[in-house]
């Protein structure tokens, strides 16, 4: 019976794998797989060949992995991983529809993300550089910040018809006109962080490939890391200390940058200027004396390193100034009126919009400490000024011009012999010179004698 079947198969087919036992073991596994898969044409020999017809698939290691995955699928044509469906069909089937599936998979991989992904938020993300924002970008950013951080009581009409350049020019006082102090810190901090992040992105991508595919792959992760890092800093920064200048700690390298200590920077200058020397201390010097020591921060403290300070307890400052000047009735009203005297002298100014806040002008202080022009002449010619009174006192002592002319001794030379030289000299003869004849030493002693 078996011999009859082999003979019949040898007549209708030239493929030895159908009747030769030597090929049975090699073809057993593909036959079982294809039978289990329920294919209607599994018996055709050209459908069983596991090798792809194209040469480019032979040397790729992906064929082995996909083949193993295919062997363990238990006859199923659907892979448990979506990204493996097209690869498996490409290697096994060899049909015309399979290359289309593979190409569609690659297009889907390199194309934009679907709407239901978490990166859908990128559709409302504005350009990285806030100075390039349009009015619509400013509106989107403001709406996003309100929803993201739960900000309330913001006058959105204040930001209408405002582009990115105008937004970046706003300072803290401008934001306070549209919202509260807390919202101002949040908006200013995030705006400053975006500007620094744009500089970081420009520096890292200026010498790299700018293709669109790299941008699609890198932008979602960069945006998520940037927003996550800023959120962490906001949660820690707003609970610890107020932000200075709209930027808390983020630098160009996304590392925390500590704020400089104003007491270390301004401390030596404050101590030097606060020392009045032998004279009485002035009010502005007294304030610098308090600011030179951080232990006085409970009543007066620096606000940054630009000379701005604030009286946290103005009554205590006035009380200490009253003790120094022995004025027990001193209060802040009297002290503030005394401070106005320094405005015209450019020693300090009042910070507008802030209570009990002032700012020292160190350049004006340096000019105020310069010696007066009349005082400089006292030190420019000290010998001449000290010489003249001594010279006249010397004349009175030696009685150079007596009351009676007869008492004046007469020498062999005429006393007025050199009168013409005396009055025609360049110095008008105010001081004696060697050309004028002198009397004996008993009457006109030398000016360098015992009287000096």
From Swiss-Prot:
It is found in: Nucleus. Residues 281-361 bind DNA. Residues 246-257 have a biased composition (Polar residues). Residues 112-198 form the PNT domain. One of its GO terms (cellular component) is nucleus. Induction: Specifically up-regulated in leukemic clones with F-MuLV insertions up-stream of the FLI-1 locus. InterPro entries: Ets_dom, ETS_fam, Pointed_dom, SAM/pointed_sf, SAM_PNT-FLI-1, WH-like_DNA-bd_sf, WH_DNA-bd_sf. Keywords: Activator, DNA-binding, Nucleus, Phosphoprotein, Proto-oncogene, Transcription, Transcription regulation. Expressed in both hematopoietic and nonhematopoietic tissues. GO terms for biological process: animal organ morphogenesis; blood circulation; megakaryocyte development; positive regulation of transcription by RNA polymerase II; regulation of DNA-templated transcription. The modification Phosphoserine is found at residue 39. This is Friend leukemia integration 1 transcription factor. It comes from Mus musculus. The lineage of its organism: Eukaryota, Metazoa, Chordata, Craniata, Vertebrata.
């Amino acid at each position: 019976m078996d011999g009859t079947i082999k003979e019949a198969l040898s007549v209708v087919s030239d493929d030895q794998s159908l009747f030769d036992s030597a090929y049975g073991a090699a073809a057993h596994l593909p036959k079982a797989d294809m039978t289990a898969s329920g294919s209607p044409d599994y018996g055709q020999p050209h459908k069983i060949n596991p090798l792809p017809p194209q040469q480019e698939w032979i040397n790729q290691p992906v064929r082995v992995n996909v083949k193993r995955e295919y062997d363990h699928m238990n006859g199923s044509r659907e892979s448990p991983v979506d990204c493996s469906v097209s690869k498996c069909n490409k290697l096994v089937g060899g049909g015309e529809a399979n290359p289309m599936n593979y190409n569609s998979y690659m297009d889907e991989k390199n194309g934009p993300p679907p709407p239901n992904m978490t990166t859908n938020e990128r559709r409302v993300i504005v350009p990285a550089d806030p100075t390039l924002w349009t009015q619509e970008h400013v509106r989107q950013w403001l709406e996003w910040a309100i929803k993201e951080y739960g900000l309330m009581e913001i006058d959105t009409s204040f930001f209408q018809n405002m582009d990115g350049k105008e937004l970046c020019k706003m300072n803290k006082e401008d934001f306070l006109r549209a919202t509260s102090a807390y919202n101002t810190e949040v908006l200013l901090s995030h705006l400053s962080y975006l500007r620094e992040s744009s500089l970081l992105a420009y520096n890292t991508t200026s010498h790299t490939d700018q293709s669109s595919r790299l941008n699609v792959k890198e932008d979602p992760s960069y945006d998520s890391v940037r927003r996550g890092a800023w959120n962490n800093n906001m949660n820690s920064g707003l609970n610890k200390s107020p932000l200075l200048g709209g930027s808390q700690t983020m630098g160009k390298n996304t590392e925390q940058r500590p704020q400089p200590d104003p007491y270390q920077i301004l401390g030596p200058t404050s101590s030097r200027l606060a020392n009045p020397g032998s004279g009485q201390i002035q009010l502005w010097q007294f304030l610098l004396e308090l600011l030179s020591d951080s232990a006085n921060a409970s009543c007066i403290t620096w606000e940054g390193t630009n000379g701005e300070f604030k009286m946290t307890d103005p009554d205590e400052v006035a009380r200490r100034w009253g003790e120094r000047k022995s004025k027990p009735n001193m209060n802040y009203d009297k002290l503030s009126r005394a401070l106005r005297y320094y405005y015209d002298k450019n020693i300090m100014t009042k910070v507008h919009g802030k209570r009990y806040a002032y700012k020292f002008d160190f350049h004006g202080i340096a000019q105020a400490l310069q010696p007066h022009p009349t005082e400089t002449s006292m030190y420019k010619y000290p010998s001449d000024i000290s010489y003249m009174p001594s010279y006249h006192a010397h004349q009175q002592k030696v009685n150079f011009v007596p009351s009676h002319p007869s008492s004046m001794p007469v020498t062999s030379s005429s006393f007025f012999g050199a009168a013409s030289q005396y009055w025609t000299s360049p110095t008008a003869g105010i001081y004696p010179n060697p050309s004028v004849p002198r009397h004996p030493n008993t009457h006109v002693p030398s000016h360098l004698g015992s009287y000096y």
